[in-house]
Regions:
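Regulatory and interdomain segments flanking nucleotide-handling catalytic cores
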Residues: 1-197
C-alpha cells in the first residue's frame, strides 16, 4: 500500500502528501501553486474518483506481482483475482487539512489496536472492550505490548515530497516514522506552509 500511495503521489496532478494506513489511502490535492495551476480533471468528482481508483488498482497489482515474484507461493494464491479500489473526493478548507489527517491517524490507531486484539482473541472475548482495555488484555494475557509495535503499524505512514541534494531535485519518499499528529501538528502544518510559499 505504501508503494501504491507513492505511485499515486508521483502521478496525480497537484498531490502534496499521501497518508496510508491498512487498506486506506488519503491524498491531499491542491490547485493553488500558481495563478495558472489547474485542478486535476477540472474538479470533476466522478473523473477524479474513477481515475484515482483505477490508478490505485493498477499500481497495487503491479507492486503485488513484484512481491509475488520475490516471495513466491506465500502471495501467489492471493494474487489471482487482483485488487480493486473505490475512491471518494471532497473539498475541505485549508484550515481543516491538519484536522483531517489527525482524524485519519486516530482511525489508524484504533484499527491497529483492534486488529491486534482480533488476531489474538475471539470476538466474544473482546466484545465491548475499548482500546485501552484491549491493550491491557493483550499485555496481561498474551504478553503483547501494543506500544512496542512499529510506528507504521500503529499510526500509518506518509508519502512526502523532499528535496534530494544528490540528484538536485525533489522526490517522493515514504516516511514510516511519522509523529502522533495531535502531539506534533507541525508535521502537516509545515507541508501546508510550503504550499503557501
Amino acid at each position: 500500500m505504501q508503494q501504491t500511495t507513492k505511485s499515486l503521489c508521483e502521478n496525480i496532478q497537484g498531490c502534496k502528501i499521501g497518508y496510508v494506513e491498512s487498506d486506506e489511502i488519503s491524498l491531499l490535492l491542491t490547485d493553488y501553486d500558481t495563478l495558472q495551476t489547474d485542478a486535476w480533471f477540472d474538479y470533476s468528482v466522478q473523473k477524479i474518483c474513477s481515475v484515482s481508483a483505477s490508478m490505485a488498482a493498477l499500481f497495487f497489482n503491479k507492486h503485488w506481482q513484484k512481491n509475488v515474484a520475490e516471495l513466491g507461493d506465500v502471495y501467489k494464491s492471493k494474487s489471482e483475482l487482483g485488487a480493486y479500489f473505490d475512491a471518494r473526493a471532497f473539498n475541505i478548507p485549508k484550515e481543516e487539512i491538519t484536522n483531517y489527517f489527525i482524524w485519519r491517524q486516530n482511525d489508524a490507531t484504533r484499527n491497529s489496536i483492534q486488529g491486534l486484539a482480533q488476531a489474538n482473541f475471539s470476538q466474544k472475548q473482546i466484545h465491548s472492550l475499548n482500546n485501552s482495555q484491549l491493550q491491557d488484555k493483550l499485555h496481561e494475557e498474551k504478553g503483547i505490548n501494543w506500544n512496542d509495535c512499529k510506528t507504521v503499524e500503529k499510526r500509518g505512514s506518509c508519502v512526502v515530497h523532499v528535496f534530494d541534494k544528490s540528484i538536485n531535485r525533489s522526490k517522493w519518499v515514504i516516511d514510516e516514522e511519522i509523529p502522533i499528529f495531535t502531539q506534533n501538528r507541525d508535521y502537516i502544518e509545515n507541508i501546508l506552509k510550503k504550499l503557501e510559499g
